[in-house]
């Protein structure tokens, strides 16, 4: 009944959200939950590239399609805030303007680090407070400790699940079929 009430233009969103309503391993075509542009790009993904993502977490993070695939996986687990925080920190480190540095630092803290932040990442009290203290004089390294903790958490927890997921295994299978 609800599907009848939704306008036709939202069909793509229903497909993406439908995938999210299942457990992450039950969603065989994760490209359905990616935006159109990465979806087209993933069709050009080579088996070699996708296989290299299993070499290390940093290899995955250095590949834009790897990040897109990992983000799609994390969305199915409702834990994409960790990756979004890590990416925001990487972008923050490229900031050259002092005025922008201060405003971006506060925005990232309020979005991801502060207690009850809208997309709060799971870090310990000491790291949160050290990061809060770093905001008194923001620098390009003020989030390094928190970013490192989040990186370790994803590397030890989410990344191994991603590599075992039906989503990733299907991606490898799809890229191998394109070679045949």
From Swiss-Prot:
Matching Pfam families: RGS
GO molecular function: GTPase activator activity; GTPase activity
Membrane topology summary: Peripheral membrane protein
Family annotation (PROSITE patterns): RGS
Superkingdom field: Eukaryota
Domain RGS: 56-171
Cross-referenced SUPFAM superfamilies: Regulator of G-protein signaling, RGS
Quaternary structure (record): Interacts with GNAO1. Interacts with GNAI3.
Name listed for the protein in its UniProt record: Regulator of G-protein signaling 8
Native species: Homo sapiens
Lineage of the species this protein comes from: Eukaryota, Metazoa, Chordata, Craniata, Vertebrata
Gene designation per UniProt: RGS8
